[in-house]
Each structure stands twice: as structure tokens, then as C-alpha cells.
Amino acid sequence: MTVRIAINGFGRIGRNVVRALYESGRRAEITVVAINELADAAGMAHLLKYDTSHGRFAWEVRHEREQLFVGDDVIRILHERTLADLPWRELGVDVVLDCTGVYGNREHGEAHIAAGAKKVLFSHPGSNGLDATVVFGVNQNELRAEHRIVSNASCTTNCIIPVIKLLDDAYGIESGTVTTIHSAMNDQQVIDAYHSDLRRTRAASQSIIPVDTKLAAGITRIFPQFNDRFEAIAVRVPTINVTAIDLSVTVKKPVKASEVNQLLQKAAQGAFHGIVDYTESPLVSIDFNHDPHSAIVDGTQTRVSGAHLIKTLVWCDNEWGFANRMLDTTLAMAAVGFRLDASASTKL
């Protein structure tokens, strides 16, 4: 069965989802039938074809009126501001990928379903009222047909959760701290300008800027046993893509750095192949641009202090890796079937 998807919001993640779909060769599994975006069709086509971070798109892209052509495929363009007005029923949409970054609660998901979609996948952390939050590679096998409104968590959650799981399963995590070193985002300023967050009033290209993060909450959403045992901070740095995460955990069992690396490398080659990668090459952030993995462990930076404090550095392409996980989760949601009885919903 080919899953019919619609994309709501054609920004960084929405466009990368389309690119990843075509580059990964999954067009027999997923078809994009519509994109809803307030910007005009000319701008949508141009930014899909030309991308500063990911280069030129290999497929021919053009637009005519309210249609986007990618190769021989035709995608309907919509410019609806109100979710209730979206023609998902008419278009036979199986899953809506909501990539706006604005919508994320159950009410928004129900609006997509009322418009005719069978399921909804948010490209960002949602409220506690959603049916499930999925980190692909860790808990997607817990999805059920009645899970209709789902979050794909965040790029940083997808990056760090597999590593936390591996370390906890092997050594037993007591507590941890996380520092996210994240590329600049489009909620920052090119030059100094007003923003409700005074730090984000400052030019993104000129400073390392601390920002709020809910990553600790994202960790405990997947692993409730770590409630009040993880803390996280985040800074934005003057690069336009790729993120590094500094993870420090205290563990119950004594361990050496070489053993940690052996564990993570084995997982990358085995159970977490395609999700986690491992490297000991002397690489920098640009080298991970366009990497489809959720997490790339930098083995050269693993440290252990006092046999119980582990520090690791984990990289990710916060756009490309996450866009690929959106596709993975979409297929996982479709694979368990579509149960339309909302009263049967159970939470994951």
C-alpha cells in the first residue's frame, strides 16, 4: 500500500521531508498529494530546488498555478489558514505531516482528522494530550492503530534518546545533564531586532546565544523513570545546520571509556543500524551535514571520570536526520493500520 500524505507547513522540515522522500527512494511507499503553505507557489518551488544547507535538488521542480511538479509527480498546493478548511477527505489523505512548528496539541490534531485525514504526525514535541510520542528506533513498535495523533518528538530528542537507552540498558543511569549546541534557527535575528526573548534580539551570526530548551521533558516523556533525574541547557551557535549534544550521565556500574565506545559502535553496526552511527575520524560539524542518522557518536570525545561519570559527544543533522525519521514514523503509523474509532484511543 502506498501511503498518501499531505504536508502542512513547507519550511525547513517540510521541504526536507520532500527531498528525503525522493532521495531515499521511498516513492513507492509514500506519495505526497498536497502541501499547505501560506507562501506563494513560486517561492515554494524555488526553495525546494535550491537550498543553502543541502544544495540543489536532483529532481526537476516547477510550478503551474497551484500545482507543484517534482519530476513527473504532481502535488496540489493549498494556502489555507484554517485547519477545518483543508480538503484532506477529498484528497484521500492517510497521514498529515504537520511541519508548521505552530500546531501541536490534540485540538489541532483533531481538526486535521475532522477535515478527513486518518492520522496526524507533528514534526515537533506536542502536548501531553497526544496519543503517542515516537522516537523511531526506540519505541515505534509500541504504536497501535488507534494512535491517530502522534508527535515525532524533536531533532535533539531523536538524537539523544537512543544513546541514553543504550547507556541505561548497559550500565544503569542514575542521573544526567545535557547541553545542546544547536545551529541558528529562523526564530533568531539577522541583525539586532526585537524579540520576546531578549537574548534572541541579538544577531545570530555574531554570538553564542543561550536559549530555553524542553529537552529534559522530552527525555522523561519517552523514559518516565528519569523524571527529575535529567536537566538540559541549550545554546545556539553561528552555523546554519548540524547540532552537537554533550551528554553526561552517572551510572551504577563501573565502566571504562573504551567499553562505552565498544558498546555504542556495536549498536551502530547492529540493533541501531541506520539510526545511530559511530565515528572516530577527526570531523567537524559540516562533515555531518546531510547525514540521515538520528545520532552520530564521536568516539574521540568519550570520557569517563571516576568509573561512574560518562561524557559523550553526539552529532546530528538537525534537519536531514529528523526529516528521514518523519518518513520512518509515517510508515510505522500506516503499518499498524487505521482505526477510526476515536473512543478506542490509548496513550503511548
Curated annotation (Swiss-Prot):
Protein's pathway: Cofactor biosynthesis; pyridoxine 5'-phosphate biosynthesis; pyridoxine 5'-phosphate from D-erythrose 4-phosphate: step 1/5
PROSITE patterns: GAPDH
One Gene Ontology cellular component annotation held by this UniProt entry: cytoplasm
Reaction(s) this enzyme catalyzes, per UniProt: D-erythrose 4-phosphate + NAD(+) + H2O = 4-phospho-D-erythronate + NADH + 2 H(+)
Record has Oxidoreductase as a keyword: yes
InterPro entries: E4P_DH_bac (IPR006422), GlycerAld/Erythrose_P_DH (IPR020831), GlycerAld_3-P_DH_AS (IPR020830), GlycerAld_3-P_DH_cat (IPR020829), GlycerAld_3-P_DH_NAD(P)-bd (IPR020828), Glyceraldehyde-3-P_DH_1 (IPR006424), NAD(P)-bd_dom_sf (IPR036291)
One Pfam entry name: Gp_dh_N
Any one GO molecular-function label of the UniProt entry: erythrose-4-phosphate dehydrogenase activity
Primary location recorded for the protein, binned into one broad class: cytoplasm
Xref: Gene3D superfamilies: Dihydrodipicolinate Reductase, domain 2, NAD(P)-binding Rossmann-like Domain
Protein's UniProt keywords contain NAD: yes
Function in brief: Catalyzes the NAD-dependent conversion of D-erythrose 4-phosphate to 4-phosphoerythronate.
Family: Belongs to the glyceraldehyde-3-phosphate dehydrogenase family. Epd subfamily.
Name assigned to this protein: D-erythrose-4-phosphate dehydrogenase
Organism: Salmonella gallinarum (strain 287/91 / NCTC 13346)
